[in-house]
């Protein structure tokens, strides 16, 4: 299992909630941490709290909807640390809970610009530099249980954005060299400020969540999971797919004749 002692970690959306809890967890492992988000006062308070716990932490304002902000974050991180060992692509926002037939397209674009394109920008900009850096690194993006199943009524816009993050991570895993661990962090219901206080109190604490997923990140897992019962919902989805295959497209000898992955592998030189 990998040690993050003396590592350098960048976390977007790192001043509150899951991002802040992960900043503490990495810091307690001995890592140097840079947290980023648009609100300077939240960053200042978060870094002060981290430093009170003896964590080497710095901050930079960053709006993940702007590529130039993420480029500036990368510039600052490499200048501050000399190298970046971990990126936690965490910044995210809620979408209005409205059905597809009633949601304004402006609201849909807004949630995708942060939750998906913000993570795409982070992965592209930091990923390129990590490849050039050439040393062991980790690039994790925060999805959701809604990357796999519907758990909240009328949360289709948010769910679609988190499904898109899953797709990005799965593709990125194949594109990145072996020395870069790429994975999806999969929170269930975590009690953060994204939820109203009476509701948030019912969820897993952000610190507990970080404690559960940190060993998985250290181990380079494809998925870093938490809420145990969610496997029931995930299994239900794939059982439904399997049932349809068994009924309408059952396996047969030589059924890999149209398998695209096999075709692509055969076309590779050598």
Regions found by a protein language model. Give the residues of each.
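Active-site loop of short-chain dehydrogenase/reductase
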Residues: 7, 30, 56, 83-84, ...
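Substrate-binding pocket helix/loop in short-chain dehydrogenase/reductase
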Residues: 98-100, 104-109
């Amino acid at each position: 299992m990998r040690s993050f002692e003396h590592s350098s970690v960048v976390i977007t959306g790192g001043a509150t909630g899951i991002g802040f809890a992960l900043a503490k967890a990495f810091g307690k492992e001995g890592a140097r941490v840079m947290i980023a988000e648009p609100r300077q006062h939240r960053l200042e308070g978060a870094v002060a709290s981290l430093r009170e716990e003896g964590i080497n932490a710095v901050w930079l304002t960053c709006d993940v909807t702007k590529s130039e902000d993420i480029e500036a974050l990368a510039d600052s991180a490499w200048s501050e640390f000399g190298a970046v060992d971990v990126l936690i692509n965490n910044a995210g926002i809620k979408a209005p809970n409205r059905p597809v037939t009633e949601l304004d397209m402006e609201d849909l674009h807004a949630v995708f610009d942060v939750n998906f394109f913000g993570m795409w920008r982070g992965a592209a900009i930091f990923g390129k530099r990590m490849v050039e850096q050439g040393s062991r690194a980790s690039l994790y993006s925060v999805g959701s249980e809604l990357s796999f199943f519907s758990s909240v009524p009328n949360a289709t816009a948010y769910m679609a954005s988190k499904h898109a993050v899953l797709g990005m991570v799965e593709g990125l895993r194949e594109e990145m060299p072996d020395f870069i661990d790429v994975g999806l962090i999969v929170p269930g219901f975590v009690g953060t400020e994204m939820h109203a206080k009476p509701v948030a109190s019912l969820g897993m604490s952000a610190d507990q969540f970080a404690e559960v997923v940190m060993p998985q990140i250290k181990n380079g897992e494809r998925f870093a999971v938490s809420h145990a019962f969610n496997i029931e919902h995930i299994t239900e989805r794939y059982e439904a797919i399997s049932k349809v295959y068994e009924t309408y497209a059952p396996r047969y000898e030589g059924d890999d004749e149209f398998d695209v992955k096999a075709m692509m592998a055969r076309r590779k030189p050598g």
